[in-house]
């Protein structure tokens, strides 16, 4: 199952979203998930958008019904703090939002879908995908 990061949700709010991202969103049969952190980030972006911007309303009408929003709890907070402390000791400090998003994906065994693979490439055991890039071509194995 997939956990969609803020940049994917933001792309899906656009009037003309990236065709590859939209196609994956529309064709996915597994439940699509996001963190309450990501939902807050895109809602905040919509709130500070210029007057008359209707992207949030479009998102709520067209995209939100297809998403399950995962809440935070104490165990995710503990895991996020552990991850952030580990990353800081390795010289890769990240903000609390990224820590909570990574913890949510890791704890749930989810694939984090993000454009910012580099932000999460150091998280041990975390699987990521970038729907903005074409899928990697299958490599034939010799017989």
What residues fall within each predicted segment?
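Alpha-helix capping/helix-boundary segments
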Residues: 8-9, 38, 76, 100-101, ...
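Short, well-structured N-terminal submotif of metal-dependent ribonuclease cores
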Residues: 1-34, 46-62, 135-142
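Generic structural signal for small/hydrophobic residues in well-ordered secondary structure
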Residues: 5-6, 42, 80, 105, ...
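Residues at the C-termini of beta-strands that transition into short coil/loop
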Residues: 36, 73, 116, 132-135
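Active-site neighborhoods of divalent-metal-dependent phosphate/nucleic-acid chemistry enzymes
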Residues: 68-115, 140-143
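Nucleotide phosphate-binding site architecture
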Residues: 9-10, 40-43, 121, 129
């Amino acid at each position: 199952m997939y956990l969609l990061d803020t940049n994917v949700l933001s792309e899906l709010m656009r009037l003309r979203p990236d065709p590859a991202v939209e196609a994956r969103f529309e064709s996915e049969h597994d439940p699509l998930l996001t963190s309450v952190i990501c939902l807050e980030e895109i809602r905040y972006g919509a709130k500070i958008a210029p007057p008359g911007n209707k992207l949030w309303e479009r998102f709520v009408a067209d995209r939100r019904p297809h998403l399950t929003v995962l809440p935070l709890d104490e165990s995710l907070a503990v895991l996020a703090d552990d991850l952030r402390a580990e990353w800081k000791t390795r010289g890769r400090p990240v903000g609390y939002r990224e820590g909570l998003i990574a913890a949510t994906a890791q704890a749930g065994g989810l694939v984090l879908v993000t454009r910012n693979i580099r932000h999460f490439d150091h998280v041990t055991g975390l699987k990521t995908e970038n729907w903005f890039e074409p899928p990697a071509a299958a490599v034939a194995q010799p017989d």
